[in-house]
Regions:
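A short glycine-rich, Lys/Arg-flanked "PGG" loop and its adjoining helix->strand segment in the class I
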Residues: 568-584, 609
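Hydrophobic beta-strand segment of the Class I
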Residues: 521-522
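Conserved beta-strand signature within the Rossmann-like core of class I S-adenosyl-L-methionine
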Residues: 586-592
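Nucleic-acid modification enzymes, centered on SAM-dependent nucleic-acid methyltransferases
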Residues: 46-142, 150-514, 533-560, 574, ...
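Intrinsically disordered, low-complexity linkers and terminal regions
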Residues: 1-67
Length: 642
């Protein structure tokens, strides 16, 4: 890591890590990378349950040890030894269940910095950590997802953030909350201001990577400066792909087409006034069952002025009354420049372009130059690496394969967005910079649907959450613009000031934490068949070069031949690990969000088999209708866990 990325307190000079001093943060990283490289050569190390699928090179490129490894983290024991406090039965610990219902929105800038399927607002988790822990305590999240528990643990040391939760903090760092009894209110002490340390792990490489980006301090201004330099370099490679002619004549279009055909990086500004593409609308093309004529969905089915898609519409060729279900998509075969083989996909054509000239926006129907430029970008391959992993079999992955023939990761991107993303990715030399790739790589794809809002086609829009669904009307955003937007949002990380978390990539069942070493755990585990994480994460993980090992994924899935009972067994094994790691008498909070009684019964059984006892149920409103379950580790008697 360049020292300029670190927070101002560590910007240059010696740094301390796990009790040892290093000349610089870069020296620290290089030292631990060498140790990790040696560890990766150990066959037994790679046998740890949940070890991701990836090369040593890719794992090392992503990792920032000891704080984060894109594989099982071999430095967790060192972290606990350095920061943890041994269990002492003579030290009193008596915390009552946290009875208050919690409501926290999901609109905090830090919460929105990087997308992920399910996220608990870190401000909500802070309330639980403050209730059950003291400054410096170790907090575990064994299903860490995007790492909100780590953020919450660290921000318990931020006076301003703690006070924003409605608490009071006195000059000595005592935290008070308001309580009412018999109509009288008073402020009672219940915690202390101070950061807690966290141990985060997740089976998914992209989840642990996002957790790393959230929990790693950086100088946001220097980070943005470096990222903007990379973006400028990438735009020099592919900026030409997002130009369009403004009010061209027929002659100018013809001249532009010739320029596009003859030049590898055509500059159309010499032909006509040009604009920069904001987004392009793509439409499915169907075949009429009566005359076999082409039916462009946008042209035939969409009521442009009314802002709706008609259920019934006429064939433009024969006039037959059609519905979307009565037609079949038109397919075509072409040479895939990345696979080097012929593939077959559903036809989608550009039907509208939104662009700007200066600061003014315009819309147009694609002209001959636009079609030729798009054709060029779809058929070329640059020297920059792009993920071409084949989609695994699954519930979510089946839809894009069957509907549009998208069989590999790179198929989810238009030619120019694929080239743009690859160009930026190739120039990111540190994993923190690659977080900008993952910020856009799942969302800015052919999953992004066109919508009609406030009287305008193209306003709003987005992908369907929890799916890989490809809509019939796709809004292709300018990837360079989206990367620029991602860079501008990095200011929200200013609250993260120190490396108080250690992050591992592995299954909960395989993690090795010394018994009786954790002070509190907050987890948000998968629930039955709610979300197929490994399938949805595949696009993201393709870009970082590390894929989830699905064997130990705790879900219910026909594609993986995992029944509800298999899910229960996997959850039991994972919860046993959490149980063993917790100090006696300590607490774990488990959030759940599944309305199926059978799934909840399976979870209850898993909890009981792991040794937990339910103490309280309370609502956790994150504007998604979910709940949490509070549990307590029983006090041991004669060394036996009851």
């Amino acid at each position: 890591m360049n020292d300029l990325f670190k927070a101002p307190t560590n910007a240059s000079g010696p740094v301390e890590c796990l009790g040892q001093m290093y000349p610089s943060d870069q020296a620290r990283r290089e030292h631990f990378l060498k140790l990790l490289a040696i560890k990766l050569k150990d066959p037994d190390f790679r046998k740890i349950e949940g070890f991701p699928m990836g090369t040593d090179e890719d794992i090392l490129a992503l990792s920032d040890p000891p704080y984060y490894t894109a594989c099982p983290n071999p430095f967790i024991a060192d972290f606990i030894k350095h920061y943890g406090k041994p269990y002492d039965s003579s030290v009193p610990y008596n915390k009552e269940p946290f009875f208050a219902d919690v409501s926290e929105g999901k609109y905090d800038p830090l919460y929105k910095l990087h997308p992920y399927h399910t996220k608990v607002p870190h401000r909500a988790i802070m309330r639980y950590i403050l209730q059950y822990t003291a400054p410096g305590d170790l907090v575990q999240d064994a299903f860490a997802g995007s790492g909100a528990t780590g953020i919450a643990a660290q921000l318990c040391g931020n006076r301003e953030v703690v006070q924003s939760l409605g608490y009071k903090v006195d000059p000595d760092g005592i935290v008070y909350r308001e309580e009412s009894e018999d109509g009288k209110t008073s402020w009672l002490p219940f915690s202390r201001l101070g950061a807690r340390k966290s141990i985060l792990s997740d089976l998914s490489p992209i989840a642990s990577f996002i957790a790393y980006t959230y929990n790693t301090p950086s100088d946001s201004h220097e980070f943005q400066r470096e990222a903007q330099e990379i973006l400028s370099e990438a735009e020099r490679v592919g900026g030409w792909m997002f130009q369009t002619l403004h009010n061209p004549t027929t002659e100018q279009i013809s001249s532009a087409v010739s320029e596009i055909k003859s030049d590898d990086t055509p500059d159309l500004s010499e032909t006509c006034l040009t604009g920069r593409v904001n987004y392009t609308v793509w439409s499915d093309v169907f075949s009429c069952p009566e005359c076999a004529g082409d039916v462009v969905f946008w042209d035939s089915a969409v009521d442009k002025e009314g802002g709706k898609v008609n259920d019934h519409f006429p064939c433009p060729s024969c006039g037959a009354s059609l519905t979307k279900r009565s037609m079949e998509r038109k397919w075509h075969k072409f040479m895939d420049p990345y696979l080097g083989q012929v593939v077959e996909q559903a036809v989608q054509v550009p039907v509208m372009i939104n662009y700007k000239v200066g600061k003014k926006r315009f819309q147009k129907t694609p002209d001959g130059a636009d079609i030729e430029l798009i054709k060029k970008t779809e058929s070329i391959r640059t020297g920059d690496w792009c993920p071409t992993f084949a989609l695994p079999s699954g519930f979510n992955t089946r839809q894009p394969i069957e509907s549009h023939g998208l069989t590999h990761v790179h198929h989810f991107y238009t030619g120019r967005n694929r080239i743009a993303l690859a160009a930026f990715n190739a120039r990111c030399k540190h994993p923190l910079l690659k977080s900008l790739i993952t910020t856009v790589a799942f969302r800015i794809t052919k999953r992004y649907g066109l919508t009609y809002q406030a009287g305008v086609w193209g306003a709003g829009g987005g992908p369907t959450n929890g799916t890989l669904y490809i809509p019939s009307l796709v809004k292709e955003l300018n990837m360079f613009e989206m990367l620029d937007n991602a860079i501008s949002k990095c200011e929200s990380k200013a609250e993260i000031q120190s490396s108080d978390a250690i992050i591992s990539t592995q299954s909960t069942q395989g993690i090795e934490i010394p018994p009786n070493s954790i002070d509190y755990a907050f987890i948000d585990p998968p629930f039955g068949a709610n979300i197929m994480y490994s399938e949805l994460n595949f696009l993201w993980e393709g870009w970082i070069g590390a894929l989830t090992d699905r064997k130990s994924e705790a879900i219910e899935s026909k594609a993986q031949s995992k029944s509800l009972n298999d899910y229960r067994k996997l959850m039991t094994d994972g919860l046993k690990k959490v149980f063993e790691a917790l100090k006696p008498g300590r607490w774990v909070t488990i959030e759940f969000s599944n309305t199926q009684a059978s799934v909840w019964n399976a979870i209850q059984t898993a909890l009981q088999e792991a040794g937990f006892v339910v103490a309280n149920v309370a609502a956790l409103d994150k504007q998604k209708g979910s709940f949490n379950r509070l549990l307590k580790y029983p006090t041991p008697m004669r060394g036996t866990l009851l």
